[in-house]
Amino acid sequence: MAASTMSVCSSDLSYGSRVCLPGSCDSCSDSWQVDDCPESCCEPPCCAPAPCLSLVCTPVSRVSSPCCPVTCEPSPCQSGCTSSCTPSCCQQSSCQLACCASSPCQQACCVPVCCKTVCCKPVCCVSVCCGDSSCCQQSSCQSACCTSSPCQQACCVPVCCKPVCSGISSSCCQQSSCVSCVSSPCCQAVCEPSPCQSGCTSSCTPSCCQQSSCQPTCCTSSPCQQACCVPVCCVPVCCVPTCSEDSSSCCQQSSCQPACCTSSPCQHACCVPVCSGASTSCCQQSSCQPACCTASCCRSSSSVSLLCHPVCKSTCCVPVPSCGASASSCQPSCCRTASCVSLLCRPMCSRPACYSLCSGQKSSC
């Protein structure tokens, strides 16, 4: 059987569209060419006639060839295919998956899964959330939500960290361990409780508070109650987190820079004056050293140190923890000037003899 080119199968029907396979006989064991192969090396129809194939002697799948018949044999790409499949059946690779469009397969069973076979009888027919064959598809990579199926929406709980939304599944909220349903465009009126919205109710909408572990925000005008706005960063921030004068209606508290609430529902216990000069009438309360600051004791914000603690002038009264007397028994001369104050903003006395005033003794500071 001689051939002038590297044809795959002879177009002569007397050879039965046979192809020479490597290793089928000794004379052509290392070549795909059919020039030197005897007729006994050609084996029956592993490929279609030569015009349908390439010039290299390679068996071609029936499904991927335009010459292949209407039958579709199972393959790794189509493990669920039946004999009624046509070349229009879905084909897949390890990177991209496609679905059966115009084929005996129903579109309901065509749900792509990460790096898994999806065809006429896909793995979506057996799901972990419910037993019905039209149940939603779920995998460890990407999950989809069931909208028009016997499965309840409760079975749609994706385990991946990326929202998966389609145009027809807008009524089903996407939730994952990374992105909450609030930030998902497919979430409308339904809001499932999540670690991001521990206090949210079923009436929450996407306008509900959203948070992160770095910069929390609060809900201002939304159906969510203020109780659901509990950030995990620093210390909970209420209402509008800012230090400006026009937002004094609610205290901002954090471990970084707290603000003082003057006329607000917050009590003065949350007032730590660090922001503006208008907050000098609010006593500084800290776990390190409380001060009995009056209006003349605290400097303006421009004189406050880097740690945002008000320092006392030389006329400030500093209570000594070991003294039982009131703060007024301390003389102003006990406090050093601003240049002598430490970086922690603690007023310090110039001489230990000043402390004797707390016990009623006389001393010159």
From Swiss-Prot:
Keywords, in A-Z order: Keratin, Repeat
Sequence repeat feature ranges: 41-45, 46-50, 67-71, 89-93, 99-103, 109-113, 114-118, 119-123, 124-128, 129-133, 135-139, 145-149, 155-159, 160-164, 172-176, 186-190, 208-212, 218-222, 228-232, 233-237, 238-242, 250-254, 260-264, 270-274, 282-286, 292-296, 297-301, 316-320, 334-338
Secretion signal span: none
CC terms in the record's Gene Ontology section: cytosol; keratin filament
The keyword Transmembrane helix is annotated on this UniProt entry: no
Short name of any one Pfam family annotated for the protein: Keratin_B2_2
Keyword set includes Repeat: yes
Region span, 29 X 5 AA repeats of C-C-X(3): 41-338
Tissues expressing the protein: Restricted to a narrow region of the hair fiber cuticle, lying approximately 20 cell layers above the apex of the dermal papilla of the hair root; not detected in any other tissues.
Subunit structure: Interacts with hair keratins.
Role of this protein: In the hair cortex, hair keratin intermediate filaments are embedded in an interfilamentous matrix, consisting of hair keratin-associated proteins (KRTAP), which are essential for the formation of a rigid and resistant hair shaft through their extensive disulfide bond cross-linking with abundant cysteine residues of hair keratins. The matrix proteins include the high-sulfur and high-glycine-tyrosine keratins.
Similarity field: Belongs to the KRTAP type 10 family.
Protein name: Keratin-associated protein 10-6
Species of the source: Homo sapiens (Human)
